[in-house]
């Protein structure tokens, strides 16, 4: 699967324990914020990147919780030296 650099960065953060918080306006998601496990904000995560990852099934939200990497997302992310 072809994944852009922005998508790889977001998936890498999520694979290490990060979360994507989302805000809704009635029914639609209008804003997202990607937070790594240390509490730092990832600037590369915008609404378009979020939509692409969600459409491909690489991220998922369980029970209204923040979005995390799904099993498919963890398999799709490329290995990097600092992965845990």
What are these regions (language model features)?
Residues 19-20, 59, 83:
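A general structural signal for well-ordered secondary-structure junctions
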Residues 54-64:
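A short, conserved structural fragment
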Residues 65-70:
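Minor-groove-contacting beta-hairpin "wing" of winged helix-turn-helix DNA-binding domains
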Residues 72-84:
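Short, amphipathic alpha-helical interaction segments positioned at domain boundaries
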Residues 2-47:
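Short amphipathic alpha-helical interface segments
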